Amino acid sequence: MDLKLVFRIAAVIAAINGLGLLFMGATFFAMANMTATPNLITVGQFTGVTVLFLALLQWRIPDIAGDAFSSLGQLFAIGYAMWFLIVGYHIMTGQAGGAAAYGNLVVEAVLAVLFYMQSKKSE
């Protein structure tokens, strides 16, 4: 496995989440034990488009980053660690739960570690 593959895996996962938020917001929020109000679905749709943009960015970074490739991998390691912390906090405080929240927690932890390890190898 190399850093390019980690970016591509993260991009596919982000695209799935982005499309889910955009087109199946009520289902996504229900899986996280949240009540899907019309306002929450609207915010979810906006977030879905944002996550789709991040997926596109993650897919393209290996091709366009040049000398900054390893540094961007380290930056994404920090980003995934931050997502891990906020989802963990939401689980601990009871604001999110269920398989979706725990699944995201695991995925974010794995991606944070992979981004960090592979970016160090690429230096």
Functional labels for PLM-detected ranges:
Residues 1-12, 69-72:
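Interfacial segments of alpha-helical transmembrane regions
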Residues 22, 59, 88, 112-116:
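Membrane-embedded alpha-helical segments of multi-pass transporters/permeases
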Residues 109-123:
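Membrane-water interface at the C-terminal end of transmembrane alpha helices
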Residues 63, 85-102, 120-121:
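Membrane-helix boundary connector in multi-pass membrane proteins
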Residues 72-87, 107-110:
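Hydrophobic alpha-helical membrane segments
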